[in-house]
From Swiss-Prot:
Residues 169-229 are annotated as: RGG-box 2. Residues 1-53, 158-230 are annotated as: Disordered. Component of the small nucleolar ribonucleoprotein particles containing H/ACA-type snoRNAs (H/ACA snoRNPs). Keywords: Nucleus, Repeat, Ribonucleoprotein, Ribosome biogenesis, RNA-binding, rRNA processing. Required for ribosome biogenesis. Part of a complex which catalyzes pseudouridylation of rRNA. This involves the isomerization of uridine such that the ribose is subsequently attached to C5, instead of the normal N1. Pseudouridine ('psi') residues may serve to stabilize the conformation of rRNAs. The lineage of its organism: Eukaryota, Amoebozoa, Evosea, Eumycetozoa, Dictyostelia. This is Probable H/ACA ribonucleoprotein complex subunit 1. Belongs to the GAR1 family. The gene is gar1. GO terms for molecular function: box H/ACA snoRNA binding.
């Protein structure tokens, strides 16, 4: 009787101890997790503050972009004076007194003489401006003018085929390639017209003088020279 009672006491003591151990372990583990969650919350709060700082980004300085030219349909037209920048569409425009007068509406004209129109704000009179009054914009409201310029593409060389006849054809192809290059590099109809004039001039000269006839004329001139004993 006393022996069984001893086992009972042993078992009870053993299990009780293990149970207590688990209770302590669980409490410690969960407590640790609670602290980790608090750490994550603090981290996110700091990140949100960083984004708030970016929202308050300061604007740039005011720079001269053009001068007043004339009035057109309740808007003012200004001539671009900046050499390397153009204003963005709808950007705010300021007067010489640094007061906002309107926004850029359109940009037009050849690349060496650019104009832009300004849609005036309510209460601003177009007749209040004088010729060559300076116009300003924020330095963050401009774009480099070079992004609107197309770089001339290199002319691809026509490979020559073996044989005399093939060489003559290659020369003719080269002449046409130059004409096409003139059209691309002219950046306008004026350049294109010049290219055509030069091509026809050379062609006509070839017929009169023989040697200036171009690739095709050169081939025929060579044949003629052969017959004459040249």
């Amino acid at each position: 009787m006393s022996f069984r009672g001893g086992r009972g006491g042993f078992g009870g003591g053993d299990r009780g101890g293990r149970g207590g151990g688990r209770g302590g372990f669980g409490g410690g583990d969960r407590g640790g997790r609670g602290g980790f969650g608090g750490g994550r919350g603090g981290g996110r709060g700091g990140f949100g503050g960083d984004r708030g700082d970016r929202g308050g980004y300061a604007s740039g300085e005011n720079i001269e972009i053009g001068v007043f030219s004339h009035v057109c349909e309740e808007q003012i037209v200004c001539k671009l004076t900046a050499t390397e920048q153009v204003p963005k569409f709808n950007c705010k425009v300021l007067s010489s007194s640094k007061n906002t007068i309107g926004s850029v509406d359109e940009i037009f004209g050849p690349i060496n003489k650019v104009f832009f129109s300004v849609k005036l704000d309510s209460g601003v009179q177009a007749t209040s401006f004088k010729e060559n009054d300076k116009i300003f914009v924020d330095s963050n409201s401009v774009l480099p003018i070079k992004i609107f310029l197309e770089e001339p593409k290199p002319i691809a060389k026509v490979p020559k085929t073996p044989g005399a006849g093939g060489a003559g054809r290659g020369g003719r192809g080269g002449a046409r390639g130059g004409f096409g290059g003139g059209r691309g590099g002219g950046a306008g109809r004026g350049g294109f017209g010049g290219g055509r004039g030069g091509s026809r001039g050379g062609f006509g000269g070839g017929r009169g003088g023989g040697s200036g006839f171009g690739g095709r004329g050169g081939s025929r001139g060579g044949r003629g020279g052969g017959r004459g004993g040249f």
